[in-house]
Structures are given as structure tokens and as C-alpha cells.
């Protein structure tokens, strides 16, 4: 399946299929040099899938740490210095092969190297179906996640679904959070559909039918980012679950999707408090437990610590913390939330696990 962005200019294709890695070769001859930034996990398990690619002249492999630990100033400088030592030109390609963190990091390298070189995304996880599309790239700061970055469109996104076959269950859970988020954004019917399909851990772990929901998620994100590339309006909706989720992820060092799921429950609690929305919190908690999400850490949440991270969220303005909230299905808002409401919501969330 081939999708295409529909910006006024500078569009890029998104290939989503089994065996899609073959499309990388169609781009390599266009560049003076190419650097595959490949995460250590993918290199360990899939190195042979790239044999044909390394038969091309001037293609280099750069192995980087997997996950968020690659998104540091130190790794950024080390990678840039290595690439620059090859006397690169602007007709160079940075090719990100790995999960969402790899794409974020490699994209920031591409955006800043010589003030911008070519960039190809080759996502290898479910989570990266979200992050590889839309052009957000960046690294982390001691103050929080993704606070240093840019908007930088790739030349292409090549999503080979064969990579998903060997994902450990923890990564399936983490990736499913973004798939589920897209269903929530699409409304009550889409949410019921995905919940009925992925009823429990066994079905989710099998990945049966996941291709369809990934494709739908990408289409949902495309519709939003083409309408609002620089996140001035509706693109903020894609941050559903992320204001609280990023704080939990960064402080408790849990997988991104696990934290986003906690953030999704949290925003339902906040919406109930602000709008009397009557979301069934127990339903969502029980659903996540059926899927196998480890939620025990919720009892250890410390609001004051998390609130300091929430204050650094990129959606905020001078009025304070902004959250994406589902007032009702089909009615999504970006709302300022006061500290007391946020604190009470955190306390209420913890009561479900005592």
C-alpha cells in the first residue's frame, strides 16, 4: 500500500507493506553518500535484511543505542562528528532504521547536518507508525522529553511490516497505545471496533489484523498533519494522553506507549472533572489490564514531581498547562487545566489501584 502526503509542495510517499524494504534501493543512487542509523536491536536481529543495501557504493552503517537513550546531546554530537568525517555534501541521506526514538534522533541529525540533508524513515516497530509520519524530529533534555527538535519532512517513509514479527510483547503494548489513540480520535465507533478486535493479551500478541489498524492510524495522522503541520491547531489532538504520559514516561522510565495509556486514563478523569463527561474510568482500566499493561506503578505516582515535568510540555503557553481532552467522543478540546484539578485527578487515578 502506498500513501502520499498532500501538502501544497514537497510531498513524500509512505510505503506500508510486507517486504517494503525493497524500496530503499530505489533512492540510494540519488545520493552522494547515505548513512543508515540503525538501532542496536534491529542490527542484532535483522542485519542480513540490509545486505543488498550495503552493496551500494557509499552506504555506511552507524549503529546507535535502541530507545530513548539514543536521544542525548552526547550521542547527537558523536554521530554528527562521525558523519562529518566522511566529507559529506548536502546531497547526503540519513536513513533511520529502528523504532520511534531512532527516527526522532536520525531526523534531528538530518535536519541540522549542513542545515539540512535528505532523510528517509524506515520504522521497525508499531509505535513508529505514528512518529515516522508528520515530520517531528528531536532529542531529549534534562528538563523533559523532545524539547529540542524541529519539523522536518522525510524524503520517504518505508514501513516494512515484516519487522513486527519479532517484536517483544512489551513493544507491542507500547506501540498499540498510539494505534488505540488514533481510534479514540476517530470516535466511539472506531474505539468500540478496535476494543472488540483486540479483546485480550493473546489476540494482541498474535498481531492478527494489526496491519489494517496501523494503516488506518497512519491515514488518520496524515489527515491531521497535512491540515496543521506546525501544530497550531488540530495537530495538538495527536498529543492525547501525552501531557501526563510524557511526565510519567520521563520520570518513571517506562515505555512510551505504557505511559501514554496511563495519560489517556488520566485525561478521561480530568474531562469528567471539568465537563461532567461521565467517561467510564473502570472500563478503560479493565481493558488495559486485559491486554496486559502493567499498571501497578500508578500507586507510586508523585504529583508534585510529575507536575514540574508537565509545566515543560510543549503545548503550554503563559497561562499554564494545556491538555488534550475528550469532552465526548467526537468533541475533542485543548484546554487549560489548573494545578488543583490536575492534582485531584492524579489522586483519583491512584484510588483505582489501592
Curated annotation (Swiss-Prot):
According to its UniProt entry, the protein's GO biological process terms are: amino acid biosynthetic process; aromatic amino acid family biosynthetic process; chorismate biosynthetic process
The family database entries (InterPro entries) matched by this protein are listed as: Dehydroquinate_synthase, DHQ_synth_AroB, DHQ_synth_fam, DHQS/DOIS_N, DHQS_C
Q: Which reaction(s) does its UniProt entry say it catalyses? A: 7-phospho-2-dehydro-3-deoxy-D-arabino-heptonate = 3-dehydroquinate + phosphate
- Out of the domains of life, which is the source? Bacteria
EC numbers for this chain: 4.2.3.4
Output the HAMAP family linked to this UniProt entry. Answer: DHQ_synthase
Q: Which family is this protein grouped under?
A: Belongs to the sugar phosphate cyclases superfamily. Dehydroquinate synthase family.
Q: What's this protein's name?
A: 3-dehydroquinate synthase
Amino acid at each position: 500500500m502506498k500513501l502520499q502526503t498532500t501538502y501544497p509542495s514537497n510531498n513524500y510517499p509512505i510505503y506500508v507493506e510486507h517486504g517494503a524494504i525493497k524500496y530503499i534501493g530505489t533512492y540510494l543512487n540519488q545520493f552522494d553518500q547515505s548513512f543508515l542509523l540503525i538501532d542496536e536491536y534491529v542490527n542484532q536481529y535483522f542485519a542480513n535484511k540490509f545486505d543488498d543495501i550495503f552493496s551500494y557504493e557509499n552506504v555506511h552503517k552507524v549503529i546507535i543505542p535502541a530507545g530513548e537513550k539514543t536521544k542525548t546531546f552526547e550521542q547527537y554530537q558523536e554521530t554528527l562528528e562521525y558523519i562529518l568525517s566522511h566529507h559529506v555534501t548536502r546531497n547526503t541521506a540519513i536513513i533511520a532504521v529502528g523504532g520511534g526514538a531512532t527516527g526522532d534522533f536520525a531526523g534531528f541529525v538530518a535536519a541540522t547536518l549542513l542545515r539540512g540533508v535528505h532523510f528517509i524513515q524506515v520504522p521497525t516497530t508499531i509505535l513508529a507508525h505514528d512518529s515516522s509520519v508528520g515530520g517531528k524530529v528531536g532529542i531529549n533534555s534534562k528538563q523533559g522529553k523532545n524539547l529540542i527538535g524541529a519539523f522536518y519532512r522525510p524524503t520517504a517513509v518505508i514501513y516494512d511490516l515484516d519487522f513486527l514479527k519479532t517484536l517483544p510483547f512489551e513493544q507491542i503494548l507500547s506501540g498499540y497505545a498510539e494505534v488505540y489513540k488514533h481510534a479514540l480520535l476517530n470516535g466511539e465507533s472506531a474505539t468500540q471496533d478496535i476494543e472488540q478486535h483486540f479483546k485480550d493479551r493473546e489476540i494482541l500478541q498474535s498481531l492478527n489484523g494489526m496491519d489494517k489498524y496501523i494503516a488506518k492510524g497512519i491515514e488518520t495522522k496524515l489527515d491531521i498533519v497535512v491540515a496543521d503541520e506546525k501544530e497550531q491547531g488540530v495537530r495538538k489532538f495527536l498529543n492525547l494522553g501525552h501531557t501526563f504520559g510524557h511526565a510519567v514516561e520521563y520520570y518513571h522510565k517506562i515505555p512510551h506507549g505504557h505511559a501514554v495509556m496511563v495519560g489517556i486514563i488520566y485525561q478521561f478523569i480530568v474531562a469528567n472533572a471539568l465537563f461532567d463527561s461521565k467517561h467510564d474510568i473502570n472500563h478503560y482500566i479493565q481493558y488495559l489490564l486485559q491486554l496486559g499493561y502493567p499498571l501497578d506503578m500508578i500507586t507510586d505516582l508523585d504529583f508534585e514531581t510529575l507536575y514540574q515535568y508537565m509545566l515543560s510540555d510543549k503545548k503550554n503557553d503563559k497561562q499554564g498547562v494545556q491538555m488534550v481532552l475528550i469532552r465526548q467522543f467526537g468533541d475533542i478540546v485543548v484546554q487549560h487545566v489548573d494545578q488543583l484539578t490536575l492534582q485531584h485527578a492524579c489522586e483519583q487515578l491512584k484510588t483505582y489501584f489501592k
